[in-house]
Amino acid sequence: MVPQVHQVGDQVEVIVSDNCSTDETSEVVRWAQQYISIRYHRNSTNVGSAANYFILTDELARGEFGWLLGDDDLIRENAVTSVLDAIQTNPTIDYIFVNHSYELITEREKKGDLVTGADFPKLGDLLCYETQNHVVLRWEEIVRFSRTPALFTSIVSSVFRLSRWKVESAKIKLDRDDSFRSLENTFPHLCTVARMMIGKPAVYLGYPYVILFVGGQNWFGDWPTMLFVHVLKIADLFAELAADKQLVACYRNTLFEHSAWQFRQLIFYPTPLSRDIFSLRKLVARYWNMPTFRKMCWVAIKLQLSESWIGSLERAILK
């Protein structure tokens, strides 16, 4: 990021909100401040990731647009200039969607501490398969470009006009003690953007300018629960905001078509969170009429039976 920000000068404001970390964040910031201007803020306590997002956007940021990046995320060459160009070319549009590719966090760890986007030249798996840049007439139409469940849940996907964002973010009531138990406390950024953008035009940047690393998140083990509790509620939110019914159905179908493994984990290997907030009975009652849901259920059962059979065979051979 440092060379890219240095290239554009004062067009970009970089803010680091240190959520009371115990690592070397402050030392890294001091190093980077030799080359670019960075505002550094440290929370006195760990306020949770969601609240930290809102501290950045609603209290610290002074620019016209905001782009949230996590501490593990990397950006590829020309990411900053491409976003700036999209903003300048489309002055009346409030939102830019940025595509990203996925890498395992273990691949990043193999390369040491000092890594950049250039260390991952292969694009890998993409969030959205559409790689051309264009304007969509309605933000929610981006749903058609992805076969990945949980589109829009990554903070890195969204570049947004802060004045419009703050109108909606002010309505979000965060409760750290309720983290991951409600849609707003799990994906407050998505709730904010959806209420801000449903039915409105957006810029779509199809090239994966961001590299998102998966597997290191402290909530990763509860991802199956989040998928089948909160991500399904995102489709409900879209419907409440009068999104096209076909797009709402597409969002749900994408989840069911590509989440059999996660469903199997949720059903056969429950976690404390899933026991607390997930109901299989309610899920089946609501979605059994959808062919994609029924197929996912059968695939999940087959996966479990297959693994059980293989495990039994291996134990028999070892004997």
Model segments located where?
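Nucleotide-sugar donor-binding/catalytic module of glycosyltransferases
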Residues: M1-L227
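C-terminal subregions of glycosyltransferases and related glycan-biosynthesis enzymes
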Residues: C191-A194, I198, A202-K319
